[in-house]
Design a protein with these regions (language model features):
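Proteins that catalyze or organize thiol-disulfide redox chemistry
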Residues: 1-26, 31-56, 64-79, 84-109
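Conserved residues in the N-terminal Rossmann fold of short-chain dehydrogenase/reductase
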Residues: 59
């Protein structure tokens, strides 16, 4: 599920890539075994390419980064967290569409 336009997050780089970012960040909490996660991944990849330079799109594998999942109270996946200026501003759990994602990003601007 990695793509050159998306950032693979873990406990070591989360703070620098998300909480210290000067750009809005979408963080996708996902797992390899999650069907809906695989369905939403191409939408996030498109957004990462289209909004490159203005928005970061990042992914956290919940199986490999359980402490981040606990910290952000992830109880179902996919869960998309929207950060701006290091603060959590919005959250979606479950499948959504590209228009909704873009609308939520635009609201952060």
């Amino acid at each position: 599920m990695e793509n050159s336009a998306t950032i693979d997050l873990n406990e070591a780089n989360f703070e620098n890539e998300v909480t210290k970012s000067d750009k809005p960040v979408i963080v996708d909490f996902w797992a390899e075994w999650c069907g809906p996660c695989k369905m939403i991944a191409p939408l996030l990849d498109e957004i990462a390419k289209e909004k490159s330079g203005t928005v970061k799109v990042a992914k956290v594998n919940v199986d490999q980064n359980q402490s981040l999942s606990i910290k952000y109270n992830i109880r179902a996946i996919p869960s998309l967290l929207f950060f701006k200026n290091g603060r959590l501003r919005d959250q979606i759990t479950g499948m959504t569409n590209k228009k909704d994602l873009i609308g939520r990003l635009d609201a952060l601007a």
